[in-house]
From Swiss-Prot:
Amino-acid positions noted as binding DNA in the UniProt annotation, renumbered to this chain: 100, 119, 162
Protein name in UniProt: Formamidopyrimidine-DNA glycosylase
SUPFAM superfamilies given in the database record: Glucocorticoid receptor-like (DNA-binding domain) (SSF57716), N-terminal domain of MutM-like DNA repair proteins (SSF81624), S13-like H2TH domain (SSF46946)
UniProt superkingdom: Bacteria
Metal-binding found in the keyword field: yes
Protein keywords: DNA damage, DNA repair, DNA-binding, Glycosidase, Hydrolase, Lyase, Metal-binding, Multifunctional enzyme, Zinc, Zinc-finger
Assembly information from the UniProt record: Monomer.
Secretion signal span: none
GN (gene name): mutM
Cofactor(s) listed in the protein's UniProt record: Zn(2+)
Annotated catalysed reactions: Hydrolysis of DNA containing ring-opened 7-methylguanine residues, releasing 2,6-diamino-4-hydroxy-5-(N-methyl)formamidopyrimidine; 2'-deoxyribonucleotide-(2'-deoxyribose 5'-phosphate)-2'-deoxyribonucleotide-DNA = a 3'-end 2'-deoxyribonucleotide-(2,3-dehydro-2,3-deoxyribose 5'-phosphate)-DNA + a 5'-end 5'-phospho-2'-deoxyribonucleoside-DNA + H(+)
GO biological process: base-excision repair
């Protein structure tokens, strides 16, 4: 599933084609994805101007001129693709239609935004902009890891006394929003913390030290366009490249990259997810 860096990369890719532009025509090609689309969604989107695109955790919000926001979740395999527009150095022509093209937005200026989702775990909804943060998908979320509200004191307080593994705590969207399996593995490796260690056992210094590492990993991943392991593509259809710099994720059986360490990357399963770690470096 796309995590914060992938969603932020897609948001940035959509912005030139959508922000400030009118939705000339919206087409909805089925009744639902993970959940039913809101009633008359195509009609309600057509003629609306996109005021801005923003991200909350793993969700994109397109604020519209009529006072509503289009809430977008990519799910497992969803892609928001831009065509008919100049993106960077290249013009991206419209691709042939696919049976997995579920929502199409024809934008003022000739760009087309296509929501393609083969597995249909994605979602779209319309919500009043002023009440967007109260939407059931957003209301439970913790602070943004790149925002000012997420600091060492906050994280230390939230981890204190917790008897869940530190990995599970960082994946808890109520504690910090947007982190997923890949980036938590990478953060814990850089921090030298074992994924199975109890969150409440961290010293205050260890807990506070996670914050700059979380930001470091996320910003590096955004700069690389995210991580493409299976379905993820940027808005222009290009792959992300952060997977080429993974230090631990997906490297089971390979030597640890820490200078002077003789360890081998191992894999354990926690709550159905693979956790990659160095048993020598991470304690």
């Amino acid at each position: 599933m796309p995590e914060l860096p992938e969603v932020e990369t897609v948001r940035r890719g959509l912005e030139p084609a959508m922000a400030g532009r009118l939705i000339a025509e919206a087409r909805v090609n089925r009744a639902d994805l993970r959940w039913p689309f809101p009633p008359r969604m195509a009609e309600r989107l057509t003629g609306q101007r996109v005021l801005r695109l923003r991200r909350r955790s793993k969700y994109i919000l397109a604020d519209l001129s009529g006072g509503q926001s289009l809430l977008i979740h990519l799910g497992m395999s969803g892609r928001m693709l831009v065509s008919g527009a100049q993106l960077g150095e290249f013009f991206h022509d419209h691709p042939a239609p696919s049976r997995h093209d579920h929502v199409v937005l024809e934008m003022e200026g000739g760009a087309r935004i296509t929501f393609n989702d083969a597995r249909r775990f994605g979602a779209m909804d319309l919500v009043a902009t002023e009440a967007a943060e109260a939407h059931p998908l957003l209301a439970v979320l913790g602070p943004e890891p790149l925002g000012n509200a997420f600091d060492g004191a906050y994280l230390a307080a939230r981890l204190e006394g917790r008897r869940t593994p530190i990995k599970a705590a960082l994946l808890d969207q109520r504690i910090v929003a947007g982190l997923g399996n890949i980036y938590v593995c990478e953060v814990l490796f850089r921090a030298g913390l074992a994924p199975g260690r109890l969150a409440g056992s961290l010293s205050r210094a260890e807990a506070e030290g996670l914050v700059p590492l979380i930001r470091e990993v996320l910003l590096e991943a955004i700069e690389a366009g995210g991580s493409s392991l299976r379905d993820y593509r940027q808005a222009d259809g290009e792959l992300g490249y952060f997977q080429h710099t993974f230090r631990v994720y997906g490297r089971e059986g390979l030597p640890c990259v820490t200078p002077g360490c003789s360890g081998t990357v191992g894999r354990i399963v926690q709550s159905g997810r693979s956790s990659f770690h160095c048993p020598l470096c991470q304690r």
